[in-house]
Curated annotation (Swiss-Prot):
Entry-annotated residues carrying S-nitrosocysteine: C93
Taxonomic superkingdom: Eukaryota
Keywords (A to Z) from UniProt: Acetylation, Heme, Iron, Metal-binding, Oxygen transport, Phosphoprotein, S-nitrosylation, Transport
Lineage of source species: Eukaryota, Metazoa, Chordata, Craniata, Vertebrata
Organism, as annotated: Piliocolobus badius
Protein name: Hemoglobin subunit beta
In-chain residues carrying the UniProt-annotated modification Phosphothreonine: T12
Length: 146
């Protein structure tokens, strides 16, 4: 991902304030609510029958935290996203058979959740920088798909 120094600083500064536990669970939960077909990848998570069930589900929260942990690793390696996400790309492609379009959806949901949490601090410039990052991460996660 090519970010200007200002964009990189904006992404890093905001990410330092992110509560990964809270934002991760909320982002994954919103993905599962807004795009219910994504729930099929999470059969083992138990009750996902309503928005409240999804948002209160401890397995959704735990996996959301794990997802944002991986995203944090990506932020530390913006110059090598494909390498950073190579194993996760293989896992999601070969074993989990996740449609790579879902990575784009989750990235967009994450941007919305960040905007909700940070309000005026999430300026159009910060949003534009995060859109570049989530697009780069989605592309890296889709890299191993044939």
């Amino acid at each position: 991902v090519h970010l200007t120094p200002d964009e990189k600083n904006a992404v890093t500064a905001l990410w330092g304030k992110v509560n990964v536990d809270e934002v991760g669970g909320e982002a994954l939960g919103r993905l599962l609510v807004v795009y219910p077909w994504t729930q099929r990848f999470f059969d083992s998570f138990g009750d996902l029958s309503t928005a409240d069930a999804v948002m209160g589900n401890p397995k959704v929260k735990a996996h959301g935290k794990k997802v944002l942990g991986a995203f944090s690793d990506g932020l530390a390696h913006l110059d090598n996203l494909k390498g950073t996400f190579a194993q996760l790309s293989e896992l999601h492609c070969d074993k989990l058979h996740v449609d790579p379009e879902n990575f784009k959806l989750l990235g967009n949901v994450l941007v919305c959740v960040l905007a909700h949490h940070f309000g005026k601090e999430f300026t159009p410039q910060v949003q534009a920088a995060y859109q570049k990052v989530v697009a780069g991460v989605a592309n890296a996660l889709a890299h191993k798909y044939h």
